[in-house]
Amino acid sequence: MRKWFIGMALSVCLAGAVFGQEAEIKGVINSQIEAFQADDFASAFTYASPSIQGIFGSPENFGRMVTQGFPMVWRPADVEYLGLRDEGGVLAQRLRIVDQSGRAHVLDYFMTETREGWKINGVQLVKDQGLTT
C-alpha cells in the first residue's frame, strides 16, 4: 500500500510539472499562428526549434513549407487545444484546427525546451478522423 501511495504521489507531481508548462506552450503556438496569419514568416520562424530552423535555413523556406504543406495552420478559421501529453519525455500539444473550407484537422505539436523557452520541434497531422464543423 505504501509503494502504491508513493507511486501515485510521484505521478501527480510529474503530471503537475508537465501541465504547468501548458500556458507557455500554448502561448508559443498561438504566437506562431498569429505570425503566419500576418504573413510574418520571419517572426513565425523564431518559434521553431534550432533543429527545425537548421532544416529549413531561412524564414522564406519555412514559410513555403507551411503554406504548401500545412495551409490549415497558415490560415486557420478556428483553433482548439485538445490536450498536452508527455510522450516519453517529449511534450506533445494536440490541436484541432478548422481550415477556411470548414474541414477540421487534428495536429500534434511537438515541443522542446531551450534556453530561450519553449520552441516547436515539429508538427504532425494526425490520421484523418473524418472531422467536420
Regions found by a protein language model. Name each.
Residues 23-27, 31, 41-88:
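Short solvent-exposed beta->alpha transition segments
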